[in-house]
Amino acid sequence: MTHKIREVYIVHHSHTDVGYTDLQEQVIYNQANNIRRAVELIEEGLEKGTNQKGLKWNCETWYCVEQFLKVATKEEKKTFFDLVKKNSIGLSANYLNFNDLADCEYLTEKIHDMQEVCAKEGVTVKTAMFADINGISMGQRDAMLANGVEFLYTNIHTHHGMYPLYQNQKPYFWENEDGKRLLVWSGEHYNLGNALGIVFNKNVNFMTENYFGKAQGDVAGPLEKLHSNLIASMEEYEENGYPYDFYITSVSGVFSDNAPINPAIADTVALFNEKYGEEVIMRMVTLQELYDLIRDKVADAPVYRGAINDWWGNGVGSTPYAVKHYKEAVRLNRICDRLEEKTGVHNAELVKAYGDNSLLYAEHTWGHSATVTNPYDTMVTNLDMRKNSYASKAHEAAAMRKNEQCHLLGDILRYYNLSGKVKAVSTSHEKRVFPVEFYVETMSLPAVKVTDDKTNEVMEVQLSTHPRGVLVSFLAEFEPMEEKTFTYEEQPAPAHTLFTRTAWVGAERVRDIINTYDTESYKLPYGMENDSFKISWKVGEGITSFYNKKAEVEMCRPGLETFFTPVYECTKIRKGVYEERRLIGRNIRGLHAEQYQGDLKDVKVLDHGPVFTRVELVFDLEGTYYSSVIIKMYNKLPKIEFSYHIAKTLSEDIESVFLPLALNLPDAEVSIRNGGVTMRPGIDQLPGTNMEYYLADEGLIYRTKDQTILVNTFDTPLLYMGAMESHPILLCDNREENNKRPVYSWIMNNTWETNFKMDLSGFSEFRYGVEIVDNGSVKEGMERLSDNDKGVVTFICG
């Protein structure tokens, strides 16, 4: 039989997992050595004229090249780049295989640095590849486009995931909002070549059996088996309308991640071509060669815009406490970028320490392959600790950078004076009223007067408790990026005597009588209200109303979608911790999953003053030792801040904890930022992509014809959209109705059976904010959401 496919292009690489197979440092060391070994083998093949002269090696991630260049001799570096120019070694502009936590601003700089390093050697990198991961953010795409990358070769692993466009081995152009395009070849699994038999494996692997069935007494040799597997695959392609005369496959040196180069592949290619070359030719290629070979043949590929939404983003929910720490590191870095606009001082060393560690944390691997099946193993613990250290080191550098910036702006680094001066710095490019808060480390500060030094306005102040003393809060209006200085002065304690001529409070000091003297206190056990919002609750029933007074709309939704009310979900283990999780596929729960909604048991009024009111709603919730939502409502701002306090218990079951963010706004359009690029979930995506859950940079916005409602998710990026039950998975079809599904903050989960943690136990708070603003553009809403994330920087300056 004559086949249309005449050439097989083989991309030999090592899939970069910083972890998974071994300790991170060992993996990094090994990957640098893989490149050194590739240089040696290819050079030897060229010198001796052996089959290895045709050996090609592709560096899947630039990070591994970066590590090699750190340890390589001058001669090794020269030889390496000579082989790149000879198309014996291929380079990829993919820095690491990320999830959507990656800081794309810093990533853009790293890819720029890569191009500068290569340019000095006479090389321009126009290609990139990723393997295993189920997508990259639009911000990562734009980081590549901004640095001259033209071609991306993808190798998606469909374990709990799927490739886009309903089909693999398919080209398309991925276009951004500026009209720039990246040619993408959406390939097969990165071990397809191993499954075919390009690398002989005595132990038949599961992928070969998945693709080609189990051997039935077949005693054919390795070369013959490779031929029969390849022909079977080619026939499948051609029978299904595959239009090209080439076939692309990746291959690893062994069937494993972080695999070394395998010189035997060049021998296999030579032997195959000698025996079967008249039928089909095998050819090892670099990424640049692959791009050159196919680009004209796929010039008519379709053009798409939107996200390749990452199926593996849910893994970040397995480490909610470290992710919270990481999110604050990113926030601190963004704040420092704004403060630098004022100081003009740039600490490149701290920026690099933050950035390099933040990218290592956002690398997709997370933990050891036995994280779930053997959580007791020392290596599992070591990888987990090391992974968390990347977030911590990023946070350390960003926090130190903020200390320096504040000191330059006048921070006296002392918090003890009961009277002094405080500076507040807006990080917003918009004129706005912001809450301003600072604390004084003291046992007692009975009252304080705060005066705006510029206007002499006496601010309305509220004092409340702080873990280290007394918190001082007030509201102030700021011009864009304005620094304001305030004088604060200790005052005598106000006299606390009860007004006794009106029936409003009894001798036991309980304020529960409806009256006109104090029109707020008697309502607080049942709800809270300002000019924009009214929230009502009832012990035993929960939240009964979340009313938008400006739009005159009841925003509270029924059932599990009720705002401010945590939800715990559990799929009991019946078939073992691994198998039960494997069976959920692309769902996030099993068929027998059960949901438990928080049962409101108590209400505590924590603060009530002229600036804000703060109330704690205490819930009984399965899967937790303690569960409460603390709501802080500002009296004179259309703004609410709330935090979920959780003491999570330990379980081997498949668990998730959610906080509903669904609002009864049927005509609203929901938008998020993903890698710095705005998108509408369910709409602005490539067809056939994941629309079950998303990673959002700073939260989401609901945009109606009259208002924009901003919902900040400060500490937890994962959003789930849709039904709270196991269901057939609908891949994205870009319909408007996809954007109308209920939204939940998916705080934590342990749905994976391999490298993402099963243990969710711990204490923490997860913070959120809701603000109503006049309707503007989506861009304006997103900028304000980002401003809310950064807030005002305040410190004592005198």
Locate predicted features:
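N-terminal catalytic cores of secreted or lumenal carbohydrate-active enzymes
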Residues: 1-101, 118-119, 173-177, 331-338, ...
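Catalytic and substrate-binding regions of extracellular carbohydrate-active enzymes
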Residues: 198-201, 348, 360-646, 760-764
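Beta-strand/loop-rich accessory regions of lumenal/periplasmic or secreted enzymes
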Residues: 14, 147, 155, 278-279, ...
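CE4/NodB-like, metal-dependent polysaccharide N-deacetylase domain
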Residues: 107-146, 232-249
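Mature extracytoplasmic enzyme cores
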Residues: 1-11, 17-18, 25-28, 34-38, ...
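The substrate-binding groove and active-site-proximal loops of carbohydrate-active enzymes
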Residues: 14-33, 60-70, 92-107, 123-134, ...
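Active-site and substrate-binding clefts of carbohydrate-active enzymes
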Residues: 5-17, 21, 168-413, 427, ...
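Acidic, His- and aromatic-enriched active-site or binding-groove loops in soluble protein domains
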Residues: 74-93, 142-184
